[in-house]
């Protein structure tokens, strides 16, 4: 039999018969590893212990201590176990797909009766019974005709459709435990008992169209979460409880920031309080960009399809665009326009006005650009996933030699912004060349090297995402980690030599000839709407004082203090503090509770003593104790706190 060489993580290599399985490799290494092994990685691919290895490869054997692989297997197995449990309880249910997602999995079912929240407990109980049976998980590769016949005989039309969509040269792999079977690429654990029965929970039920197509069958989706141990599950559930308290939709109502309504799906109605946050943040970003050498522009929101065709967006992005047909002066053909889904083609039009020299580069162009993108109604989520939004968009037109310095400069800019907004924990990911791409390997080498060098120059490490770049260039992604451990990808920097070529951007080089600039698409916040949602949840509504829409409420304890209340408000406003009076005929405790729910950072209570002594009683949000201070000292302190950090 032919021999193959398997190389282990420590660099050692061993020879084996071709067709050996990772389970057999683990047994060859040690009896202990054979018992603990759950899967392998073979040449970078997660590999089932039962799959044969037929050629030379790098191999690593995984155990439950390898959390990434263990979680994937546990969640994948639980998707199958849940589908089996559902069909054992309700045999007429048809199964579709059940992928692993972040922190868990889901499975879509076609069932006449709707699932209820009470059903989740019943399903969980049945799942634990299956786990406790410790039945072996086996796999077979079937011929296409056999698989289609099997699913046709068992009245599983969705599986038949899935098989029809699988490329003909791809093997059809079937996984079994007990007498239940599913079409699946794998990998899986070796028996159901390897799944921790106390570390999973079914979370919710939702509707989902088959294959995401609203013209197809509406299915029922059950979501679950799972981890390698019950303590991790407990921590995750605690995090979800905290996330519910911080939900920007809930806090948005309590703070009277915004609302959404059916007549404008995916678009925000900003209330005065919310718009104050928006404009304060935008003013801050405008000053920061101006300081960093950006020129601000404003471009049309409705643009003829001709530009989108030329830029390539019409072919690649049309389904996400809002199309507008206009009868121009009763012309024979209606003009076809689109609300812009992004600003970059318009920025190239601005760049193209007038002759540009190499001395004009780098040219940093910024716009708070209003964009519109179609999102399915089921994907909309408060102000974090919308159809109408404003980007803090920017495009740097530069030479290839300037990519590193401009990227390093942007990283420093982004770092300052995130710190000012209360985010100190963030990471950088570098997405490299995909298989389908334009440009030579040398060009990609240079672009990727430039981004990596920029990160190092700015003093930051980065993670490489192999093959995740756009077809026209690599990119950096900047991901925030919030107070409860969730990750939010916000900032980006994308290298692009394609759009300047398509839209004929050029500058005159030192040699007197025309050259194409490189475009660096960059954003710090992403969109104002989404970032404000993240800010609200990060700070649980207790925004940094300078961003708070209502910074101070001066509340009267007695009506005899009303005049002094108004005087205090005017004094604070004159010092640049957003202050308002509350002289309603209500008890002070009621006022304090109401304004605390509204996340007002500071409440100043004023009664007889404060009037006589020209003081105020200071209560800060989240603190139970009050402190009496002079109006002069409080005004000075709050004026400083109300000053945006870039102006200090």
UniProtKB/Swiss-Prot annotation:
Its name, as the record gives it, is: Threonine--tRNA ligase
Query: Residues in domain TGS?
Result: 1-63
- Care to name a GO molecular-function term for this sequence? tRNA binding
PROSITE patterns in alphabetical order: AA_TRNA_LIGASE_II (PS50862), TGS (PS51880)
Please report which protein family the annotation says this sequence is part of: Belongs to the class-II aminoacyl-tRNA synthetase family.
| Lineage top rank: taxon | Bacteria
Which HAMAP family did the record assign? Thr_tRNA_synth (MF_00184)
Locate the residues binding Zn(2+).
Answer: 344, 395, 521
Q: Which GO terms describe its biological process?
A: threonyl-tRNA aminoacylation
UniProt cofactor(s):
Zn(2+)
**UniProt-listed PANTHER family:** THREONINE--TRNA LIGASE, CHLOROPLASTIC_MITOCHONDRIAL 2, THREONINE-TRNA LIGASE
Might you give the EC number(s) for this enzyme?
6.1.1.3
Q: Which GO terms describe its cellular component?
A: cytoplasm
Function statement: Catalyzes the attachment of threonine to tRNA(Thr) in a two-step reaction: L-threonine is first activated by ATP to form Thr-AMP and then transferred to the acceptor end of tRNA(Thr). Also edits incorrectly charged L-seryl-tRNA(Thr).
A Pfam family annotated for this UniProt entry: TGS
User: Cofactor note, please?
Assistant: Binds 1 zinc ion per subunit.
Keywords tagged on the record = Aminoacyl-tRNA synthetase, ATP-binding, Cytoplasm, Ligase, Metal-binding, Nucleotide-binding, Protein biosynthesis, RNA-binding, tRNA-binding, Zinc
Q: What catalytic reaction does the record list? A: tRNA(Thr) + L-threonine + ATP = L-threonyl-tRNA(Thr) + AMP + diphosphate + H(+)
Known SUPFAM superfamilies for this protein?
Answer: Class II aaRS ABD-related, Class II aaRS and biotin synthetases, TGS-like, ThrRS/AlaRS common domain
> What EC class does the entry list?
ligase
Q: How is the subunit organization of this protein annotated in UniProt?
A: Homodimer.
Subcellular location(s) of the protein: Cytoplasm
Q: Where is this region: Catalytic?
A: 247-544
What Gene3D superfamilies would the database entry show? 3.10.20.30, 3.30.54.20, Anticodon-binding domain, Bira Bifunctional Protein, Domain 2, Threonyl-trna Synthetase, Chain A, domain 2
